[in-house]
Amino acid sequence: MAFASLIERQRIRLLLALLFGACGTLAFSPYDVWPAAIISLMGLQALTFNRRPLQSAAIGFCWGFGLFGSGINWVYVSIATFGGMPGPVNIFLVVLLAAYLSLYTGLFAGVLSRLWPKTTWLRVAIAAPALWQVTEFLRGWVLTGFPWLQFGYSQIDGPLKGLAPIMGVEAINFLLMMVSGLLALALVKRNWRPLVVAVVLFALPFPLRYIQWFTPQPEKTIQVSMVQGDIPQSLKWDEGQLLNTLKIYYNATAPLMGKSSLIIWPESAITDLEINQQPFLKALDGELRDKGSSLVTGIVDARLNKQNRYDTYNTIITLGKGAPYSYESADRYNKNHLVPFGEFVPLESILRPLAPFFDLPMSSFSRGPYIQPPLSANGIELTAAICYEIILGEQVRDNFRPDTDYLLTISNDAWFGKSIGPWQHFQMARMRALELARPLLRSTNNGITAVIGPQGEIQAMIPQFTREVLTTNVTPTTGLTPYARTGNWPLWVLTALFGFAAVLMSLRQRRK
């Protein structure tokens, strides 16, 4: 009785919500304790039972603050190291970001308790998953979006991974919310029926992991080399270090020419404008073509627009075997989804003068097109994404083509030091390979550089914070997964059906 009385106190529930939210961080890399996702979501649902809408919204907010406060604390590393502001201000900015993201979980909990106040199957198994899908969409879309820490990613090595090639990671989010709600209902009501249904729903997708949605093409196996330069972020954009940086990458690449069909340098490996490096690029292109290798590299490009101003792009270009390199070549990729404050500054004229954090090097990029043709290097077709873009499953899928041989992502996670951020980023990249059934080549400045197999498995990787080259044979695949064909449309149809049913049944219950 004492415990039952204690748990009814709103302050206790708020504290528990904070703890259950923080527990959710353990579901993601580098911890990879996937059951923590279920425990965390169970806590969110159970704590909002028998609460008024505003109380539930507060619980949802605290739960989100626990999740994001612990799960994205790596943002502090970047702000504290490169922001040039006092410590308390750095902490405040991280708290502000976590609080903003928590508004969406608060919205979920508040609306759920407002429209479906009773602790029923309808609430936990039908309404909650549909509403969660909507609020998670909003979190990934409003103000350019920040869809980090979606619990579906926790299943990259878990029992539900087989659902990803069929309906994508968001379908796993949907199912996790449903299963967690049923488990919470079984626990609170002490009823075995929701428990049985939850176990069945959780077990049903397990055999799907054994379906192979792709066909390997061993005759097209190539040797790939990815150069991890490990250039400190504090030196990366120092003009005095440019020549040394080029030497590091060239010296690591020269022995690979003629041996590796494809050589990859990371995001902005060449820390200068492409137009300024024409002699270097053309000489390197000629050497690569003479030896039958191709190079893909990140670089910065600036182009004069119709308003007679320069648009600066975070770009990938190709050199080597095939058509000679040209500054006018269309075989390039310009990053579309830019990171606020890192690659562009909202309200630029107001914020830039305020602090160094708002005036970081290379923080005035322009957007490339949303849909871009694949890169072609040495006859290899690559669907590309730069850094943050790889977490955007629908965008990667929209750029994916049936003839894509590999997914390619280049990144620079040096901003986030030895935090958990790069591991979370890596986990999300693995999900893209699983969803689209293609090997993924991930080249980074200081880790995590790796080759991911078409089932999301790690085939090869090198340690973080080392200056090394990852060289391995990679076999391309062919074939289209159901998710590659349809994207998130089936899930949105399911969400609409669940939402309609939940509203209709709720109205009927109120009329009785």
From Swiss-Prot:
Matching CDD domains, A to Z? ALP_N-acyl_transferase (cd07571)
**Disulfide bonds, paired cysteine numbers:** none
Gene Ontology cellular component annotations, sorted alphabetically: outer membrane-bounded periplasmic space; plasma membrane
Q: What is the effect of changing V339G?
A: Loss of activity
Enzyme Commission (EC) number: 2.3.1.269
Phenotype for V339A: Loss of activity
The stretches that face the Periplasmic side, renumbered to this chain, are 28-33, 69-86, 142-168, 211-487
Q: Which GO terms describe its molecular function?
A: N-acyltransferase activity
The consequence of G145A is: Loss of activity
What role is this protein assigned? Catalyzes the phospholipid dependent N-acylation of the N-terminal cysteine of apolipoprotein, the last step in lipoprotein maturation. Utilizes a two-step reaction via a ping-pong mechanism. Lnt undergoes covalent modification in the presence of phospholipids, resulting in a thioester acyl-enzyme intermediate. It then transfers the acyl chain to the amine group of the N-terminal diacylglyceryl-modified cysteine of apolipoprotein, leading to the formation of mature triacylated lipoprotein.
Q: How does it assemble?
A: Monomer.
- What is the protein name given in its UniProt record? Apolipoprotein N-acyltransferase
Q: Which gene encodes it?
A: lnt
